[in-house]
Amino acid sequence: MNPRLKEIFYKEIQPALKNQFGFKNIYMGPRIVKVILNMGLGLDGNDSKILKSCEEDLAKITGQKPVITKFKKSVANFKTRKGSNSGLKVTLRKDKMYEFLDRLVNIALPRIKDFRGLSSNGFDKFGNYTF
């Protein structure tokens, strides 16, 4: 069974974009390839209790086990060491990505008190969005 957002995108949104912008086929239009969730731990990354609880939280949110990210360089001003834990990340693709986005847009974001929408300033020059 396909996720609801995926069906809406392929049956309604893509054909509308094709007609609006005059694309020769529907695959010339924009589409979402992946969603990456990142959680920075800062200096607490080496504390195993904090790391484990954050790992469990991110796994509950996404349904996938997160990957531990490490610092690439040592920076004295930030008191970081090369190879020490800096955070966690999860990459979602295909059906899990659409299910996550559907829950985020339709359930999680509307529950935020005084939510006024997402800012359009979150886009970079490559089409990525960060909030």
Which residue stretches match the model-derived regions?
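Ribosome-associated RNA-binding proteins
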Residues: 1-131
